[in-house]
Every structure is written in structure tokens, then in C-alpha cells.
UniProtKB/Swiss-Prot annotation:
Cofactor: binding details: Binds 2 Zn(2+) ions per subunit.
PANTHER family in UniProt: ALLANTOINASE (PTHR43668:SF2)
Coiled coil ranges: none
Xref: InterPro entries: Amidohydro-rel, DHOase, DHOase/Allantoinase_Hydrolase, Dihydroorotase_CS, Metal-dep_hydrolase_composite, Metal_Hydrolase
Binding site for Zn(2+) 2: K136, H169, H217
Name under which the protein is recorded: Dihydroorotase
Protein family according to the UniProt entry: Belongs to the metallo-dependent hydrolases superfamily. DHOase family. Class I DHOase subfamily.
An individual GO BP term: purine nucleobase catabolic process
A Pfam family that the UniProt record links to this protein: Amidohydro_1
Binding site for substrate: H56, F57, R58, N88, H282
Main enzyme class: hydrolase
Organism: Thermoplasma volcanium (strain ATCC 51530 / DSM 4299 / JCM 9571 / NBRC 15438 / GSS1)
Catalytic activity: (S)-dihydroorotate + H2O = N-carbamoyl-L-aspartate + H(+)
Length: 415
């Protein structure tokens, strides 16, 4: 049914009362008075809902850790209506068949809209599924992925021809092998995967003749080059001096406090392009003993709420959060989300800046919600709208899984 959503929308860099009409899940008009039409009033400050371009929801193959139902439910509770899932499953998503099998398992289970990456090995661009939202390259080994040592020029040309964005796990394998050692705490893990491995990867990625490339989860402000830079809340807010144990073990590692604080300063100064969660859950057994614990931190539900608390404290400008967590991520992939604009999906989140809470891991919706952010200040959205449908109402989930698969080029086809 056509209707207008009415409230104080974040529009052109400020909050203003607007009546936003929606037809078939898409914004049709933006007015002060929408006229004779059914209205739904949204409380608080109304922002476009967010996009997280970097999650690991573990479907298929490791659903004891997470599945798309629990992962996507966590996403919408955190104000995120589109997630992009990584390809490092037990059976890596390297070709059409693996991609189709994964999509078949996920369809009908996701609460948020979703897109899927394929893994780039340096020689497989001809056989990856054309619906892949992008390609992921692991320059250094990580969970379920060996390091890809190089992308030949001919492969880069093919990637450009197919129009793929490439996102890099930016730790160079040769450097990681050089520094490999036993680690029994966060400090030792940091030293075993030092910043120099990211710097080496940055030099390589910057040299590649790729039209669209992203360096994932940058952990130090010195890591820069001819690419977009993604940053995560855990590298912004946590460091290796905190008593987090294996819950804080992640790749790239949490850095020392000085590096973490400089990274946060760079982010709040507007020096980064993308804010993602790198949501990567593991079982209690996987995290039991630090030396053998698997790397990964959950964060899809807390990514935006943690940053909203920084906005309230006047540490972070809302516009920086808006650009990095909401507007820019979908725009990189040609997806019409993240703006209050005609022709964009009607995805909104309502924020009550007076309702700040402590993160309580027992109330998170991930399958195994042990969070390194437990006890930190956060502001969760009270209401979330996805394509004109209210999916979170007064902090409660009220919808069935309505998530839609978003293949590469989907929004081009709708023009």
C-alpha cells in the first residue's frame, strides 16, 4: 500500500520534518506535506538504514557458529538492512556452482537484504558467478582461506571488464610467515601479524590496475594508498592492552593503544571511506584457549549503535558516520540505499539519542553472542524500516524474514 512515512529525517546534512511517500518499497516523493495519503509517523531522529559490506554469516557449512537467519536478525536490530557476505565458507565460493548452492540455502531465511561475494584466487574470474557483488582476495591466510600471492595483469583486466569491485584482506602472506610465532595473548598476536604486513599489502594493492578496490579492516592510519579504506569498530575502539582474551583475537590483530587512538582520530577526522563490522562469529570451543583460538569478532548488531553513542558524546560527527556507515558503502556497488532520495529504497532507522544503553551480550541476537564490546555505551535504533516495511517496532522484531537477494547490477536493471 502506498503511504507516507513522516518524521524528522536526516536530509541534506540536517534533520528536518518531512513526509516521504513510498511506493513498492521505493521512495516516490519527499515533501513537507504529502497530501491525501495514509501516514505512518516515525519517532526520534530518522536516518537512512545502514549497509554492512563485510560479514561472515557462516552459511553454509558452519551454522553451529551462525546462520543467515541469526546473523541477519542481528543486522536489522543494529539498523542495518543490507549485508554483504564473504566467501570463505568451508567450501570456498570460487565458482558458479558453489555460489548457486550457497544462495539456494540462504534464500527465504534472511531478515535483511543481502549480497554475496565470490573468492578471487588469481585465476578464476572466468568462472565466478556474475551475480557476485564483488570479489574477495585474501593476500594473507585467514579463516578457511589461504593467501593469494598475486593477481596477474590479465586477470586484473578480466576483473575490470566484468565490473567487479575487489576487496582485499590486507596482510601479505610472505610477511605473515616471516613473523609467525606462538601467541598466548593479544599483545603476542599483534606482534605475530605486525602492521608492516598490512603496509606491504597496501603497497601491492595500490600497484594493481583495478578500477575499484578496497583494503579491508585497516588497523593503522599509516595503511593507505590508491584504494578505498575500510575500518571496523573493533580496531577503532579496542586495543591489545584490554583484558579481552581470545574474544578479542582477530585478523588483523587489535593494535597497541597508541595506534588504536590514532586510528580513531583519523576516522573521526573523515579520513576513511567505509565502516564495516567484519562480523565473524565462532563457537565457545573455537575460542577456548588463546593460542589455538580462531580469529574473529562479532559486531554486525553493535556497529552503528556504538558509533551513535560517540555521536551523542560529541566525539564523532554524525555526518562522518552517515557517509562511512550508511551512504557510501552501497553507492560503491551501485545500490540505491543509504539516502533519503527519490528512487532509493525506503530503508530507515529511528534513533532516540536519549536512550543510551550498555551493550549486553546476553541480549544480542547472534547465535553465540560473546562480544568484546560488552558493557560499552551504545544507542540501538527503536524502529527499522526496510523497503517500506516496518521490521523492528519499539525495539522488537515484528516481521518474517523479508530479506531480498541483491545481485550485482540489480539496481541498474530497475532503471
Amino acid at each position: 500500500m502506498d503511504r507516507a512515512f513522516c518524521g524528522n529525517f536526516y536530509y541534506n546534512g540536517k534533520f528536518d520534518y518531512l513526509e516521504v511517500t513510498v511506493k513498492d518499497g521505493v521512495i516516490e516523493s519527499i515533501k513537507k506535506d504529502a497530501g491525501n495519503i495514509a501516514r505512518s509517523y516515525l519517532p526520534g531522529a530518522v536516518l537512512p538504514a545502514a549497509t554492512d559490506i563485510h560479514v561472515h554469516f557462516r552459511t553454509p557449512g558452519e551454522t553451529d557458529k551462525e546462520d543467515f537467519s541469526t546473523g541477519s536478525l542481528s543486522a536489522i536490530f543494529g539498523g542495518t538492512t543490507l549485508v554483504m557476505d564473504m566467501p570463505n565458507n568451508i567450501i570456498p565460493i570460487k565458482d558458479y556452482n558453489a555460489f548457486s548452492d550457497k544462495l539456494g540455502v540462504i534464500n527465504g531465511t534472511s531478515y535483511s537484504d543481502f549480497a554475496l561475494y565470490s573468492m578471487e584466487t588469481g585465476s578464476n574470474s572466468l568462472i565466478v558467478d556474475s551475480r557476485s557483488i564483488g570479489l574477495k582476495v585474501y593476500l594473507g591466510g585467514s579463516t578457511n582461506a589461504a593467501g593469494t600471492m598475486a593477481i596477474p595483469d590479465q586477470e586484473a583486466e578480466m576483473i575490470n571488464e566484468k565490473g567487479f569491485t575487489v576487496i582485499f584482506h590486507g596482510e601479505l602472506e610472505e610477511c605473515l610467515r616471516k613473523h609467525q610465532s606462538e601467541t598466548k595473548n593479544l599483545r603476542e598476536h599483534n606482534l605475530s601479524r605486525p602492521i608492516e604486513c598490512e603496509l606491504a599489502a597496501a603497497g601491492y594493492v595500490g600497484s594493481l590496475n583495478l578500477k575499484s578496490k578496497i583494503m579491508a579492516h585497516v588497523s593503522s592510519p599509516e595503511v593507505s594508498g590508491d584504494f578505498l579504506r575500510e575500518v571496523t569498530p573493533h580496531h577503532l575502539l579496542l586495543n591489545d592492552e584490554m583484558p579481552l582474551g581470545s574474544i578479542g583475537k582477530v585478523n588483523p590483530p587489535l593494535r597497541d593503544r597508541n595506534t588504536q587512538e590514532r586510528l580513531l582520530y583519523a576516522y573521526i577526522s573523515g579520513q576513511f571511506d567505509i565502516l564495516s563490522s567484519d562480523h565473524a562469529p565462532h563457537t565457545e570451543k573455537d575460542k577456548a584457549e588463546f593460542e589455538y583460538a580462531k580469529s574473529g569478532i562479532i559486531g554486525v548488531e553493535t556497529r552503528i549503535p556504538l558509533m551513535l553513542a560517540l555521536v551523542k558524546k560529541k566525539i564523532l560527527f554524525l555526518d562522518v558516520l552517515y557517509k562511512t556507515g550508511i551512504e557510501r558503502p552501497p553507492s560503491i556497488f551501485g545500490i540505491r540505499k543509504g539516502k533519503i532520495e527519490v528512487g532509493y529504497d525506503a530503508d530507515f532507522m529511528c534513533v532516540d539519542f536519549t536512550n543510551e544503553k550498555k551493550v549486553n551480550e546476553d541480549r544480542l541476537h547472534s547465535k553465540l553472542p560473546r562480544s568484546p564490546f560488552n558493557g560499552m555505551d551504545a544507542i540501538f535504533p527503536s524502529h527499522v524500516v526496510m523497503r517500506g516495511e516496518v521490521v523492528i517496532d519499539n525495539y522488537e522484531e515484528i516481521s518474517d524474514p523479508l530479506g531480498r537477494f541483491v545481485p550485482k547490477g540489480y539496481y541498474d536493471q530497475k532503471l
